[in-house]
Amino acid sequence: MTMDREKERELELESAMYTNCLLLGLDPNVIGLGASNGTPRVGLFRHSNPKLGEQLLYFILSSLRGPAQSSKDFDKVWPIFDSAQSRDFRKVVQAIISELESQGALPRSNSRVSSLATCCGPRFVELLWQLSLHALREVHRRTFPADVASNPLPSSLTDVSFSHAATLLPVTKARIVLERRRFLKNAETAVQRQAMWSNLAHEMTAEFRGLCAEEAYLQQELEKLNDLRNKVKQEGEVWDDLVSSSSQNSHLVSKATRLWDSIMARKGQHEVLASGPIEDLIAHREHRYRISGSALLAAMDQSSQVPRAELLSAHSDDSASLADDKELSDGSYTNMHDHSLVDSFETASSQASDETLSRVDDRGGKINQTVDVAEVIRRWTHALQRIHKQSLLLAKANDGDGPDILRTASDGGTSGHVESLAATLTEHQQHLASFQVLINQLKEVSPAIQKSISECTEMVNSLPPTLPPVTRSNGQASSLLQSQGSGRIMEGVSNDVAELTSTMSNVQLEKVSASPTLKLPQLFSSTPTSSGKGGNGQKRQTMASQVNKMESLSEKNSTDQALSNARPDNLPTDTSSSFVHNLKKSVREAALLIPSSAGSSRDSQSDEGSEHYFVPLSATGFSRFPSETKALPLRGSRALTSLSEPSFLEPNVPDSFAPSKYSDIPDTYDDLDSFKDYDNGNGFLSVAGSNSVASDAQQSFYDIDDQVFSPPLLMDSSLLSDAYEDLLAPLSETEAALMEH
């Protein structure tokens, strides 16, 4: 609207200027007026028009100043023949306009020079109108003085408005307020309407997009349906030809259906497998039915084979190095001395466990490779899981209807699905047969193992009465445990531990191996791919066990101090030898009875020669302690680790509690029949046997320790970062073919 008004005003000004010039006596042909057309043509100065502009300026100023004055003003500059005269003419016109502005005849303006230079635009038209209006007044005054005196011109409207300004001001303000309110109301309505339309547009756009997507989806489904219909029609014709031409189809269909039903019937057994001790073995988790026997046997072999001088020198070197490290950290060597001896002894044990891969059988005289039962079960179960996953993938083919087994039967050759399914089932049957062989051999070995355990039990029960004073005082042992439970730590470590460890290195244990070597067919390669990662896991396990040993170091310090006070200065050599001899037996019994704490739970990642004995933990394993010892509060796994130290715990067992250690151990190897007779409710390994003689307090004590000793999963994720990556056994040819298929 504003632009239209400005254009209308420009046109009115130009038309009024032409009218004034015509009144002053301008020739109509100059502005293009003919005899017939009475209205002047406008828009002549929209573009630069210096010729017409100079002519109009000369005419208006000549009319204003008279012929005599104008001849003087425009001498030598009019008429214009070149650009120099044009510049001089504009200078003369600028001087006359400045004079008129100084007299008040024209309003002042800063754009006179540019307007005169261009001779176009609304400002130049306004200048011509102002000059023509002023010239018309002056000419009218000079020509008709009597008329001017009798009929004076009215005063300008600007002066009248100024005289009534006081009255018009409040009215103008009120009108401004009213217009403002009206504008704000209209603006608010417009904003609301715009928001409403915008929301409606968004909703319509979203609905349109949804409809487009639905249309595209329905179109795709329609195309799929048409393709499927055509495919079914084509395959139906081929199938009809096959049914009519072949007589073996019914037999193949029935066989395939029977095989498929057997696979689908056994599909639910994988979920039960994932929650039992077999899966604990595969995932390297700690379980109460499992203990690494090879590490303890290797430690006993090494302790009997290493000379005393070498062991003492190794102890001194390790003690010095550990003392230097400890002095750099906190400057307390006394709290570290005992721990350095234990670490050096266990370092020798771990080094010796590598040598037990090819152990010489004393009775047969031939070298038999030690078979890791846990590793065998782990790899077999891993293969079975891969086969199970492949069967599930086959089960999902064709939307759950099973694979098209008879697709290529018409070609005269065997189907690829038939071959893969037959190979899968054959390998499944082979693994199950291998499991049965393992179970049978474990049953054959179990009487010898139990016989060895019973002989060790009889030897422990027939201990001579000439024991060191430590074993005779049960009250002193209970007071040691009470001081250990209450957390009182005594400073200083006795050197008797070093003497005891060095003495243990000279004693030969008669029964080194409690179980004959398992003889199994060579089913897997001797160097699995998981050995490298197992080594990494073993390093992390060693670090975790060292942390737990550091935590329980203060508790062992207090007990060792009490032992050094109660022990005489000079023990007889035969008594010390017998004491250490029986103590080493108790080490093995403690390892077979009491599992390690959660900190050392990953000792299953040792080398391939480690043996694993599946012995259930019964309540009688804890009934050998006195009643006041059971009443002590235990402080988590650290207290249990210190309680299971065989160096000072086992000799404190009274004779009345010793016979009940192995009295309630169930026949675990008979429970392995559950691999054959599978029960969905009980799992694979059932916990058989419970202590009916134990009191309620003993039963509650066993329940508490059961939760501590058999955690379902270690909560320290740093120790289990790549536990499941160790399951990647080498692929067999059948598995590789299944994966490619």
Swiss-Prot record:
Pfam families: HAUS6_N. It is found in: Cytoplasm, Cytoskeleton, Spindle; Cytoplasm, Cytoskeleton, Phragmoplast. GO terms for biological process: cell division; megagametogenesis; microgametogenesis; microtubule cytoskeleton organization; spindle assembly. Residues 313-335, 520-578 are annotated as: Disordered. Belongs to the HAUS6 family. Residues 538-551 have a biased composition (Polar residues). GO terms for molecular function: microtubule minus-end binding. Contributes to the assembly of the acentrosomal spindle and phragmoplast microtubule arrays as part of the augmin complex. Its main location: cytoplasm. It comes from Arabidopsis thaliana (Mouse-ear cress). GO terms for cellular component: HAUS complex; microtubule; phragmoplast; spindle. This is AUGMIN subunit 6. Residues 315-329 have a biased composition (Basic and acidic residues).
